[in-house]
Amino acid sequence: MRVSIRFTPSLAKAAKMTQHDTDSEDSPTAGIMPLSGVKVVDIANFLAGPMSSMFLGDFGAEVIKVERPGTGDEVRKWGNNKDGVGLMYKLINRNKRSVTADLKSPIGVEIVKRLVKDADVIVENYRKGTLEKWGLGYDVLSEINPGLVMVRITG
């Protein structure tokens, strides 16, 4: 499975794509999962949001996780670390690909807008009003993609 995003040269420099995909095209389940063909953008951090998108990925959805530059998701350092990444992070971010983007910056906002253009679902778990302040509220994203489903998890 490949992520196909067209970036302008400045956006390409701002975004770093990495792969955390454990399902290969040679897998016996590739292409026959219940959520095959569903694209999920995961801009959540900590546990609740990433765990919900983990389950979507487990059922075949293509999940793209957006992490902040420098530190990534806070869970990266939890538990026993190997090569600077904790087991909990690897567990809840399996079957995902990762993009680095600063959601507080205009370039980061543009990256998310481009990702949701052809996405089916976006998962987030920020405090009420945070995404709206950054220009990424449902009202803005649904203008880009009217069929977008936004999953908001707090706790």
Enumerate the predicted regions with their spans:
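N-terminal helix-loop segment corresponding to the beta1-alpha1 unit
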Residues: 5-155
